[in-house]
């Protein structure tokens, strides 16, 4: 779909998840997106006994990347807006007029933290550049 044909207001965007479950991406990996209504996929999962709702963005290679990963501040992409929906609308602006976008993973940041139950976990945050 061409960018000028895409209507972002038709997309349902759920809030961010507490704990991102993500595919193992590495520095140098490329993600290709083709703009369509179907690339925005609402998800629901129970994580640590709590039901979480979020939105995944599907790549052309059928990899799901959470909207919170793609709209996180300081992730290398220049996005505007305060809410995930506003920042996703800004993400759509990165697409070419033909409706395609290629991102390259430039860094994987890992942060260790202690969960409420005392167990240890690691969060992984991605940094990107438009390829």
Question: Where are the regions that the model predicts?
Answer:
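OB-fold/S1-family single-stranded nucleic acid-binding modules
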Residues: 106-131
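Beta-strand-rich binding-surface signature
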Residues: 54, 100-102, 123-125
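Short nucleic-acid-contacting surface segments enriched for D/E, G, S/T with interspersed K/R
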Residues: 26, 82-104
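Oxidizing extracytosolic/periplasmic lumen-facing domains
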Residues: 43, 94-95, 113
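OB-fold and OB-like beta-barrel modules that bind single-stranded nucleic acids
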Residues: 33-35, 100-107
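Short His-Asn-centered micro-motif
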Residues: 60, 80-82, 106
